Amino acid sequence: LICNNEGETLLELGADAAKGGALSMINVLNEKTNPVLLCAYNNDSKFTLNFYALPLQKNQLKGEGTLAAPYQITCAAEFFQIDDQPSAHYQIMNDIDFGGAAFAGLQKAFAGSLDGGNYALTNLFLNGSGLFREVVDTAKIKNITIKQPVMALSDRTTAAGIIANTMRGGFTDDGVELHATISNIHVLSPIIAGNNFTGVCGGLIGEASLFVGMSECSVLDADIQVLNA
């Protein structure tokens, strides 16, 4: 546990199957400029990295997570916190440089909203997954440009896309349709590679099903190197 001076828990770390297995390393990066806490999870020699902006705060994101006052995302470390509340609403406030570190995608099914504000995500290296593993229910993702992302796939992945591996709507308990949508999403010059990958892949979504909407989206100059897909 990492706590503040009042004894309030700021961060709880430990083995986490959703994040990749055993917690194997904790380190502080960029200590003199924009410090972040790096946590590495090891699962059969495959590592998942999580980053947290420093200093830690009880609630690191500005905003309230509502549609009227979404959480504000200004850096990669804050983007990773979407996993903490995957049904909340988020707004990207500026271009974000992910620094090229391997990122295994947000692990929890995303059912909230993310407005990219027409800003760009750069230096994104996706290890085995898109930005989101799952986009579900009434999730809405819009107004994002992703420049030259690289996605490395393995035989452990059955579906993969730069935005999400899978995307699906559904039904409420009363039978009301739930529609998941993406709009105004543009992926520029992606590289998708995986010699042992035998699933389905796409520049935006790997596999879409059941009440999914896409509008004004594009993928330009894609280099897809998955011969067995």
Q: Can you annotate each of these PLM segments?
A:
Residues 1-229:
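Surface-exposed repetitive/solenoidal architectures
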